[in-house]
């Protein structure tokens, strides 16, 4: 059984799904995050499981995205401006625009800096 909860933060909301089979919905969730799937950039924490990475990448491809990847080594103590600079460089190099999707996979420090960068990029790019 999959449980779904919508969490609202001021003018933004987060759709959280938990339960057995939640990964089977990744493709549909990714496709609905943007108008028309085109490009997606996945930013991995360096400790992310290889198997989980395959599941996320296949879900993006199944949803119709061309996928680019970045492995980011962020300190568990927190991200730095240098980490953000690496993410911004990859967004630029991969041609990511506000019509595309950024996916953050990893610990809190990694996901935090990636989501912050996506929010700043091109006036706000969706981040999952």
Describe the function of each predicted region:
Residues 79-128:
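Glycine/threonine-rich beta-strand-loop-alpha-helix active-site module
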Residues 1-100:
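ATP/NTP phosphate-donor binding region
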């Amino acid at each position: 059984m999959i449980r779904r909860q919508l969490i609202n933060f001021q003018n933004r909301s987060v759709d959280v799904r938990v339960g057995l089979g939640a990964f089977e919905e990744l493709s549909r969730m990714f496709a609905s995050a943007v108008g028309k799937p085109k490009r997606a950039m996945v930013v991995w924490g360096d400790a992310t499981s290889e198997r989980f990475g395959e599941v996320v990448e296949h879900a993006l491809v199944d949803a119709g995205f061309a996928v680019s990847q970045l492995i980011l080594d962020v300190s568990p103590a927190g991200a730095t401006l240098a980490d953000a600079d690496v993410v911004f460089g990859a967004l630029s190099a991969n041609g990511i625009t506000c019509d595309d999707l950024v996916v953050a996979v990893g610990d809190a420090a990694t996901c935090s800096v990636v989501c912050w960068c996506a929010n700043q990029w091109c006036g706000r790019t969706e981040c999952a």
